[in-house]
């Protein structure tokens, strides 16, 4: 069996290592890959935005399964494109990828399907967003709607920091911003909950605790992840059941109502408050560093 792995991070190196251990896998391609993957797979230099070139290479090499690591190709619809050519691909389609591609899409899904999450407001311009801050309690959380490589979330301790966050997002720090999300700060402890889906059923894939702040003592701006450990010490049978029944299953139903069945890894970012789970965000792929 030939496997193609798309991406260039530590996450993709970890997936390559796991594939290498399988007796069913004869050959691994990683595009574009990195120095680590070059030791266990054949790195292929392909522009990930050129879907046609990716498709041509996969068909030419008769690759049996493609695993997409990062979020950007998923949000851009690479799965949908490859599946048109009957290429077996592991990852969510474009509709399902909106769970990560648009934080506002996910918040509206939470609202409609009664998924526990922080209270929030959606704003289309700086003036309205800043006016909202003038009457808010701090700390407060401000988020860019679109993809931001894990850096589009601001935890603002005061109005000045909130104004800076609003200006940066609307001024295009993370690309064109038509909307901004402001939500209440939940005072709890974060936990990552992983599931793996085939479009029909899903299995729990473990938990982790990710540390995102760039400085020691949980200070500084968010990153994609400075480090992680697994399993999370917060998980227990009661909490696991609540996460599945209150968050995962209603989300899958919401996607089904949008005409999409989820396939791939689903990374559920949670805040745990007194053993109650609240959805912070979804990632439609494995985390990095959590996957490692």
Please tell me what each predicted stretch does:
Residues 1-94:
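ATP-binding N-terminal substructure of ATP-dependent carboxylate-amine bond-forming enzymes
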Residues 152-291:
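Internal nucleotide-binding/catalytic subdomain
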Residues 5, 30-31, 67-68, 89-92, ...:
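General beta-strand structural signal in soluble alpha/beta enzymes
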Residues 43-49, 121-125, 156:
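Short acidic-hydrophobic, aromatic-tinged amphipathic segments that line or gate anion-handling sites
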Residues 38-41, 53, 98-104, 215-217:
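Short, charged, surface-exposed secondary-structure boundary motifs
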Residues 90-152:
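A conserved helix-loop-beta module that forms one wall/lid of the active-site cleft
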Residues 58-63, 135-136, 175-176:
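Glycine-rich phosphate-binding loop signature in dinucleotide/nucleotide-binding domains
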């Amino acid at each position: 069996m030939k496997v193609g792995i798309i991406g260039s991070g530590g996450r993709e190196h970890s997936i390559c290592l796991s594939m290498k251990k399988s007796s069913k896998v004869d050959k691994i391609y990683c595009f574009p890959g990195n120095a680590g993957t070059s030791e266990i797979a054949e790195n292929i230099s392909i522009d990930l935005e050129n879907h046609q070139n990716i498709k041509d290479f996969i068909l030419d090499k008769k690759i049996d399964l493609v695993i997409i690591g990062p979020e950007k190709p998923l949000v851009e619809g690479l799965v949908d494109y490859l599946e048109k050519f009957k290429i077996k691909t592991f990852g969510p389609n474009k509709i399902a990828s909106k769970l990560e591609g648009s934080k506002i899409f996910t918040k509206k899904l939470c609202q409609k399907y009664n998924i526990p999450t922080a209270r929030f407001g959606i704003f289309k311009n700086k003036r309205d967003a800043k006016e909202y801050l003038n009457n808010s309690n701090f700390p407060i959380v401000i988020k860019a709607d679109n993809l931001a490589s894990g850096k589009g979330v601001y935890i603002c301790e005061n109005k000045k920091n909130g104004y800076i966050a609003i200006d940066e997002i609307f001024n295009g720090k993370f690309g064109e911003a038509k909307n901004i999300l402001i939500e209440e700060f939940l005072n709890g402890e974060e936990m990552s909950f992983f599931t793996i889906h085939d479009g029909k059923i899903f299995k729990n894939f473990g938990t982790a605790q990710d540390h995102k702040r760039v400085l020691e003592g949980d200070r500084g701006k968010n990153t994609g992840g400075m480090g992680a450990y697994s399993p999370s010490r917060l998980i227990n049978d009661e909490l696991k059941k609540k996460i599945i029944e209150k968050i995962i299953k209603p989300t899958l139903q919401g996607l089904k109502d949008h005409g999409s069945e989820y396939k791939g890894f689903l990374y559920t970012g949670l805040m745990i408050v007194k053993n109650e789970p609240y959805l912070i965000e979804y990632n439609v792929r494995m985390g990095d560093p959590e996957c490692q």
